[in-house]
Amino acid sequence: AGAAPFDAYSGDIKLGNKGTLGSALTIITALDFTLTNNFAPTLVIGESTAGDMEFGTASLEGTVSCYFEDATMINRFLNETESALEVSVGDGSNTLTFRMPRIKINSADVGVDGPTSRIVNMSFTALRDDTSLSGSSTDTNTMFYVTKSGV
């Protein structure tokens, strides 16, 4: 039948300064990111398959929303603080961890929609990194890592 799907309750989101990760955040309401490899097939007339793949520049962009508790998250944007982000999800016995050792927060919007909780909506871009947080001693130009534990 396959493995059980990951759920929204068995995981952590950590955010810290570049090169470090803080403790798990408990104020995140949503997180989304997209990794684009920018590969392009080299197709030609008369062939049913591509002869090669052209490699483009990879990019990773995302958004994160969190409850407004204080100015900490907004200050990461205002002060242009390079940050590190780690997202772990699990199903009880397996964990999948996405690590971005160097991100730049591009916006921090706080709407005031009434008397309910205020939400900070932030966009970010992953940047190439050369710190030890990257998890590799040989690859010093990476923006994104995925690790798994369990099966």
Task: Indicate residue ranges for each PLM-predicted region.
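Signature of extracytoplasmic/envelope-associated structural regions
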Residues: 1-151
